[in-house]
Swiss-Prot record:
SUPFAM superfamilies: Nicotinate/Quinolinate PRTase C-terminal domain-like (SSF51690), Nicotinate/Quinolinate PRTase N-terminal domain-like (SSF54675). Transmembrane segments: none annotated. Keywords: Alkaloid metabolism, Glycosyltransferase, Pyridine nucleotide biosynthesis, Transferase. GO terms for biological process: alkaloid metabolic process; NAD biosynthetic process; nicotine biosynthetic process; quinolinate catabolic process. Pathway: Alkaloid biosynthesis; nicotine biosynthesis; Cofactor biosynthesis; NAD(+) biosynthesis; nicotinate D-ribonucleotide from quinolinate: step 1/1. Its EC number is 2.4.2.19. This is Quinolinate phosphoribosyltransferase [decarboxylating] 1a. One of its GO terms (cellular component) is cytoplasm. It comes from Nicotiana tabacum. InterPro entries: Aldolase_TIM, NadC, NadC/ModD, Nicotinate_pribotase-like_C, Quinolinate_PRibosylTase_N_sf, Quinolinate_PRibosylTrfase_C, Quinolinate_PRibosylTrfase_N.
């Protein structure tokens, strides 16, 4: 049976003349709309999700709109189109698809037999949209572009999250430009967790910061002073590349009051010529830290290696591959031809 999920149009309260959705504590501004989502989008103080949708539709429409639709589809023709999974995977982007359809034509009605995060098998019809055929076709490609990408991310995330257990899988900032929140939302739908959203919500001391500061300890000390002077409270992570750097961080933390919360263990997974990996350095670092801080493994993380990495006791495993080079899930949206012809004959247009 198909279930109908209500959709509430979202308007940012301070933009009366030009409604825009600015994502703050969630991408939805009303309580009911938030509660209707299976997985809420991550928080972002400035991300304009409605603006992203409008931009995607605008780049497709250009200055003349859909000239093919205008030429071939009667403006008042009603139709129904079905979402079809063309391969197995995890579906993500249902909530976003509803936002896009509503932006194109608020009169369109959607029904779904599944939720975001559910598994689909090849050949399954898992949703439908009803209304003006013109509107459905105009929205089709933008909806599918988002849904296929999000579903690809969610599918890989689910596989990696299952394999990484008991470690938690994270994505990175290696997202498609302009789609940061959308990509990270898909990771949540797939069962992963979000790393920092951007440069603003977590201090992350990486190799370039360490080089510029003159060493790991100096970089940490500068961060601690900065946070204290500016009365800021947020997570602090430092990248380490060797066991010596791990010892230096632990040394610093034992002698100084610090805001440090997590230690990244970068490229401590060593690929071997036989295709396996050596995690002995990573395991040594985790044992050395001994639960005093969260740990994050990074580098040489794939679906094939993530299980072995997860068995080292590391808290988190981050993978840029979740978002920077993911394969889209094959999904189509097809108009019910018989229904369209029936309506066309009835209105003497077919």
């Amino acid at each position: 049976m198909f279930k109908v999920f209500p959709f509430t149009a979202i308007v940012h309260p301070h933009a009366i003349t030009a409604p825009r959705l600015v994502v703050k504590m969630s991408a939805i501004a009303t309580k009911n709309a938030v509660e209707s989502l299976v997985v809420k989008p991550p928080a972002h103080p400035t991300y304009d999700l409605k603006g992203v949708i409008q931009l995607a539709l605008s780049e497709d429409a250009g200055d003349l709109g859909d000239v093919t639709c205008k030429a071939t589809i009667p403006i008042d023709m009603e139709s129904e189109a079905h979402f079809l999974a063309k391969e197995d995977g995890i579906v993500a982007g249902i909530a976003l698809a509803e936002m896009i359809f509503a932006e194109v034509d608020p009169s369109l009605k959607m029904e779904w037999s599944i939720n975001d995060g559910d598994k689909v098998h090849k050949g399954l019809k898992f949703g439908k949209v009803q209304g003006k055929a013109h509107s459905i076709v105009i929205a089709e490609r933008v909806v599918l572009n988002f849904m296929q990408r999000m579903s690809g991310i969610a599918t890989l995330t689910k596989a990696m999250a299952d394999a990484a257990h008991p470690a938690t899988i994270l994505e990175t900032r290696k997202t498609a430009p302009g789609l940061r929140l959308v990509d990270k939302w898909a990771v949540l739908i797939g069962g992963g967790k979000n790393h920092r959203m951007g440069l603003f919500d977590m201090v992350m001391i990486k190799d370039n910061h360490i080089s510029a500061a003159g060493g790991v300890s100096k970089a940490l000390n500068s961060v601690d002073q900065y946070l204290e002077q500016n009365k800021l409270q947020m997570g602090v992570e430092v990248e380490t590349r060797t066991i010596a750097e791990v010892r230096e961080v632990l040394d610093y933390a034992s002698q100084t009051k610090t805001s440090l919360t997590r230690i990244m263990l970068d490229n401590m997974v060593v690929p071997l010529s036989n295709g396996d990996i050596d995690v002995s350095m990573l395991k040594e670092a985790v044992d050395l830290i001994n639960g005093r801080f969260e740990t994050e493994a990074s580098g040489n993380v794939t679906l094939e290696t993530v299980h072995k990495i997860g068995q080292t006791g590391v808290t988190y495993i981050s993978s840029g591959a979740l978002t920077h080079s993911v394969k889209a899930l094959d999904i189509s949206l097809k108009i019910d031809t018989e229904l369209a012809l029936e309506v066309g004959r009835r209105t003497k247009r077919a």
